[in-house]
Amino acid sequence: MDSRITITEVRVRGFHLDGYGHVNHARYLEFLEEGRWAYVDAHPEFADGLARGVALVAVNLNIDYRRAAVMNDDLKVETCLTRIGGRSGVVGHRITHIGSGELVAAATLTFVLLDQQSGQVVPMEGAWAERLGPLVVDVSEEK
């Protein structure tokens, strides 16, 4: 597996379910968040910058739900950086069912980096471009 992609495993529990016995749509946001934090933990070049008073702030999220996840399903959340631009970046996620390999959901999250002291967006140039550029994965080349 490409070291630029992190894997987080999640077991579906009862509190994740809605009245129909499926994972509630809002809980997928938590699964994706777990994936992003695992990604930051695995990439010190990202974590070091965030530790210096910069926050990763979600500005857009798109989720494509493909298959219902139910109680006791084991899910794999794959997370990678798919694009960085001048002021924003995109994180890609794939959630698959571990047993069957079926795609459960795919998501893209657009984010900005925010200086927590000034409240201003931090441009993704200079040191940030050097940190994040090598982490970008071309998902069109993925399976």
Q: Where is each model-derived feature located?
A:
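Terminal targeting signals and extreme-terminal segments of soluble enzymes
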Residues: M1-K76, T82-K143
